[in-house]
């Protein structure tokens, strides 16, 4: 792999987008399996 590509992947906007996509997909899947839970008490 190119070092510039790895440096690009480690920048804040890319990490922020990946993290938001992961969080959104987790919430969507949890909402699919537990549709009546409006919040998740941890």
UniProtKB/Swiss-Prot annotation:
GO terms for cellular component: chloroplast thylakoid membrane; photosystem I. May help in the organization of the PsaE and PsaF subunits. The gene is psaJ. InterPro entries: PSI_PsaJ, PSI_PsaJ_sf. The chain crosses the membrane at residues 8-28. It comes from the Eukaryota. The keyword rRNA processing does not apply. Gene3D superfamilies: Single helix bin (1.20.5.510). Its main location: plastid. SUPFAM superfamilies: Subunit IX of photosystem I reaction centre, PsaJ (SSF81544). Belongs to the PsaJ family. It is a single-pass membrane protein. It comes from Rhodomonas salina (Cryptomonas salina). It is found in: Plastid, Chloroplast thylakoid membrane. Pfam families: PSI_PsaJ. One of its GO terms (biological process) is photosynthesis. This is Photosystem I reaction center subunit IX. Keywords: Chloroplast, Membrane, Photosynthesis, Photosystem I, Plastid, Thylakoid, Transmembrane, Transmembrane helix.
């Amino acid at each position: 792999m190119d070092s510039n590509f790895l440096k690009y992947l480690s920048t804040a906007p890319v990490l922020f987008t990946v993290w938001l996509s992961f969080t959104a997909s987790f919430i969507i899947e949890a909402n699919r399996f537990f549709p009546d839970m409006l919040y998740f008490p941890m």
